[in-house]
Amino acid sequence: VPLILRYVLQTCETAQEAGEVLARVPTHMSYNVTVLDRKRRYLTAMMAPDRPAVITRAAVATNHQENVEWISHARFTATVERERYLLQRLRLHRDPEEKFIGAFLKPPLYSTAFNAGFGTLYTAVYRPRKREMELRWPGTTWALSLSDFTEGARQVLVPGAA
């Protein structure tokens, strides 16, 4: 999927254009991709190798698509619980921006289950109107400009990682 996302970033201006690309480009595995453009239009593409992509107006995506197909994986990753948590925060609570973003670095959204093959590496915060983004880890934030991107590297200690 990295090549597909790179293509989308280089060729699409809007969420709609990105959705059209994601709907037609084949993928070797199932992926959920949520897209946001400068005008705050968004969509989620549920892509899979064995069926046509489904483009939705969902504002969130976790580790399952429309229905849970792999129950043990869903339990292990808490995909349904994380989706419900996010939807509840968006629809019912209207948290201030920093509180909402901070929730991505705490359970149930943040996981340190690296030894079991599932952990959160980082959280990305995108601000398309400002042409800015941040990568966040517990205790560390790396702010980046999308208008004047400067390549760089960071060494971060990820809690729970080997």
Outline where the language-model segments fall.
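C-terminal, well-structured catalytic/ligand-binding subdomain of enzymes
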Residues: 1-162
